[in-house]
């Protein structure tokens, strides 16, 4: 795998508050976007458009960005290795930014999708939930991102990563947050990952010392969760 930087970073973390958690942050953001080719042949971002390889783009917050681990240890890169292992020709692009909200994701999606993609993995909303933002806005922002992907890459398979949050905002809010992912997936006929952090969220040994971010082992489990869902569509 060979990685290259595509964008600058946004700094802030996401809060893992209980067994089911999302990702939150402050308003100051840092993060990075990286690209890897499966199998690796170049580090130039332009290659995805000029080669015959297909492109899978991971679009999310600190979970996708791999906060606190090396780019090669984050789950998108690990999924790329799995793609290599079965001989599929994909360029894997990590467009995760730590601290990202759905509003932020909506604002930058046009820039990110300057080139067409074949598979788009959408992982956003955790920061919205942990901040208690109106879920009507979260839903609208996610729908806008989906609509933009469909407009710019009509052939793309869209995968939506479900998230859950602790009950701090109340039972009704927590339930509505959890269910909006399936509702959006059903409405738009998306491929759904029911819960991205399945078997990782809230488990100390699978998270970094801050108890917030998945560690290397945690990212391996997340990669397996993602791979089980996306392998059939590649």
Language-model regions, residue ranges each:
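N-terminal secretory targeting modules
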Residues: 1-59, 67-70, 84-88, 114-115, ...
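Alpha-helical cap/lid subdomain in secreted, periplasmic
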Residues: 106-234
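Short Gly/aromatic-enriched secondary-structure transition segments
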Residues: 73-74
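Short beta->alpha junction loops
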Residues: 93-101
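Signal peptide-proximal N-terminal region
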Residues: 78-92
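Active-site metal-binding loops of divalent metal-dependent hydrolases
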Residues: 61-62, 126
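Short, solvent-exposed loop/turn elements at domain surfaces
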Residues: 64-70, 102-103
């Amino acid at each position: 795998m060979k990685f290259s930087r595509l964008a600058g970073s946004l700094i802030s973390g996401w809060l893992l508050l209980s067994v089911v958690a999302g990702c939150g942050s402050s308003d100051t953001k840092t993060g990075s976007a990286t690209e890897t080719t499966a199998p690796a042949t170049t580090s130039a971002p332009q290659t995805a458009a000029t080669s015959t390889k297909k492109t899978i783009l991971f679009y999310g917050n600190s979970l996708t960005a791999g906060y606190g681990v090396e780019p090669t240890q984050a789950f998108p890169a690990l999924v790329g290795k799995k793609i290599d292992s079965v001989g599929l020709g994909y360029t894997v692009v990590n467009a995760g930014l730590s601290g990202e909200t759905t509003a932020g994701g909506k604002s930058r999606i046009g820039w990110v999708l300057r080139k067409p993609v074949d598979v788009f993995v959408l992982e956003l909303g955790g920061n919205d939930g942990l901040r208690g933002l109106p879920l009507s806005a979260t839903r609208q922002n996610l729908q806008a991102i989906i609509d933009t992907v469909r407009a710019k890459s009509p052939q793309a398979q869209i995968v939506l990563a479900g998230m859950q949050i602790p009950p701090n905002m109340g039972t009704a809010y927590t339930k509505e947050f959890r269910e909006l992912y399936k509702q959006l997936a059903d409405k738009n006929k998306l491929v759904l990952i029911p819960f991205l952090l399945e078997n990782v969220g809230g488990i100390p040994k699978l998270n970094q010392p801050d108890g917030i971010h998945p560690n290397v082992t945690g990212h391996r489990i997340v990669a397996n969760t993602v791979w089980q869902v996306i392998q059939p569509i590649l």
